[in-house]
């Protein structure tokens, strides 16, 4: 990863996606290594993106809380109550905003946090479209 970031610096923007990011915060050593890598690639012009369904695990460590609170752009979809409780300690969310991630009306509903601005969104994708087929991630969803 590091070699690619350095080779692309000043020529291309390197985007790095860390899926299941919470797995990088299971031990102190993992958390320390990952947060250093995350900061380092940002410094050299890459755009790291963390993806997790278990934000509570991420926020259980100081490094995870710092990483999230230092993020300028966050998208939150449906969250469990325990994850919401952990998020409320790190991000200022009103009860009116929490309803978009606690009990959303439909998939595709959530919050976009950009700096100090929080915008709720509802953007369900109709199931009978090519876009839905391309982005559907539910293993139990029948895709024709």
What are these regions (language model features)?
Residues 1-11, 101-144:
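Conserved P-loop NTPase motor module
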């Amino acid at each position: 990863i590091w070699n690619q970031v350095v080779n692309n610096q000043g020529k291309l923007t390197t985007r790095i996606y860390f899926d299941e990011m919470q797995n990088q915060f299971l031990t102190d050593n993992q958390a320390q290594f990952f947060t250093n890598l995350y900061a380092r690639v940002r410094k050299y012009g890459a755009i790291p993106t963390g993806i997790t369904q278990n934000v509570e695990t991420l926020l259980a460590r100081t490094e995870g809380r710092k990483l999230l609170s230092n993020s300028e752009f966050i998208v939150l979809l449906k969250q469990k109550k325990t994850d919401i409780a952990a998020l409320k300690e790190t991000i200022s969310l009103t009860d009116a905003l929490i309803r978009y991630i606690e009990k959303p009306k439909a998939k595709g509903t959530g919050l976009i946090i950009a700096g100090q601005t929080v915008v709720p969104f509802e953007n369900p994708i109709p199931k009978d479209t090519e876009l839905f087929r391309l982005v559907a991630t539910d293993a139990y969803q029948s895709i024709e």
